[in-house]
Curated annotation (Swiss-Prot):
Classification lineage: Bacteria, Bacillati, Actinomycetota, Actinomycetes, Frankiales
Protein name (database record): UPF0102 protein Franean1_1156
Record family assignment: Belongs to the UPF0102 family.
CDD domains in UniProt: PoNe_Nuclease
Organism the protein comes from: Parafrankia sp. (strain EAN1pec)
GO molecular-function terms, A-Z: nucleic acid binding
Source superkingdom: Bacteria
NCBIfam families assigned: PRK12497.1-3, PRK12497.3-3, YraN family protein
HAMAP family, sorted: UPF0102
Length: 118
């Protein structure tokens, strides 16, 4: 596994723990279809949350939410429609979040959770 893949897996693990600690139930991780992948699908109360996780090893790469705009956000919305088609009876509220996981040089980890990011 490449370094970038290990970093991404680390970030998704941290994000899933963050969501669970916040009271969310993780329904799927790395859900795939022919059109792509959704990092995390969770239920938080009456809300179904589709999460994109961006992991950064420093500030040099910019903010995670800034990386999920335009075509990337539209692709995630399309994937969510596919997920909903395969999983009937979703909650009435649907939300798209971006979780940014920052792994600092000194080993600390910081999570920024932007709810309703797009």
């Amino acid at each position: 596994m490449r370094v970038s893949q290990r970093l991404g897996r680390f970030g998704e693990d941290v994000a899933a723990r963050h969501l669970s600690a916040d009271g969310a139930e993780i329904l799927a991780r790395n859900w795939r279809c022919r059109d792509g992948e959704i990092d995390i699908v969770a239920r938080h109360g009456d809300t179904l949350v589709f999460c994109e996780v961006k992991t950064r090893s420093g500030a040099d790469y910019g903010s995670g939410p800034d990386a999920v705009v335009g075509r990337k956000a539209a692709r995630i919305r399309r994937l969510a429609v596919r997920w909903l088609a395969e999983h009937p009876h979703p909650p009435a509220i649907i939300r798209f979040d971006v979780l940014s996981v920052y792994r600092e040089r000194q080993g600390s980890v910081r999570v920024e959770h932007r709810r309703g990011a797009f």
